[in-house]
């Protein structure tokens, strides 16, 4: 079955087909479009649904980190005739436990974050996935209209590891650049684009100088202020 054919069948599934909600057709089409030209040896997502069916036809191997939560959503995907056999590995359970415990054996060409949406769970998933995302691969972040996830979206837009290539409905698509992997075991907050300028929360002159003045000029200004 070719991708365009299966995509049409997936899009035609009713909106309530998946017990935990479904991606809009525009998002599914964007996934298929951005996957073109990529050698998808291994992809991964948190959450399951129509995207899982689509990835089973796009990738040689696909990892699904999800749990039913009593609504039968994972089983519905597993039993769908649109799921390509032998491609998808289901790692069931809370992603707060399953993602950190998983031993990734190869780079990932696409990662989609659509698991639990409460803070800090998206951020936890990102932390454990980003070192494994291959250069040129895709990071897909769903539900960026949720404030805490929108904060992640704003962070990623300024990070040198990622380039925003599309927002479809409330789903953001980032391409992994060739920038080095940010050390997941270090600090280096000052190296990250989102953190280049501190927020002003203390309005005394010295604090304003630290927040706004470039580091090379800061010492001289603080000296003039008598600090």
Residue ranges and their predicted role:
Residues 2-38:
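Class I SAM-dependent methyltransferase Rossmann-like catalytic core
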Residues 1, 226-227:
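C-terminal end-of-chain micro-motif
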Residues 29-226:
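S-adenosylmethionine/decaboxylated-SAM
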């Amino acid at each position: 079955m070719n991708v365009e054919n299966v995509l049409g069948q997936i899009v035609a599934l009713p909106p309530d087909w998946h017990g935990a909600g479904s991606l809009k057709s525009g998002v599914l089409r964007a996934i298929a479009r951005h996957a073109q030209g990529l050698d998808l040896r291994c992809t991964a997502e948190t959450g399951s649904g129509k995207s899982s069916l689509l990835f089973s036809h796009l990738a040689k191997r696909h990892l699904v980190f999800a749990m039913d939560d009593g609504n039968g959503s994972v089983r519905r995907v597993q039993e769908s005739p649109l799921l390509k056999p032998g491609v998808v590995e289901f790692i069931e359970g809370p992603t707060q436990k399953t993602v950190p415990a998983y031993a990734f054996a190869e780079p990932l060409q696409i990662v989609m974050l659509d698991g639990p949406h409460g803070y800090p769970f998206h951020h936890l998933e990102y932390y454990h996935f980003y070192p494994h995302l291959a250069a040129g691969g895709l990071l897909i972040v769903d539900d960026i209209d949720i404030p805490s996830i929108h904060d992640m979206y704003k962070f990623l837009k300024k990070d040198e590891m990622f380039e925003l290539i599309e927002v479809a409905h409330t789903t953001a698509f980032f391409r992994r650049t060739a920038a080095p992997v940010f050390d997941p075991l270090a600090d280096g907050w000052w190296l990250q684009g989102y953190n280049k300028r501190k927020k002003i929360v203390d309005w005394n002159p010295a604090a304003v100088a630290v927040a706004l003045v470039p580091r090379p000029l800061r010492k001289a200004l603080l000296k003039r202020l008598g600090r």
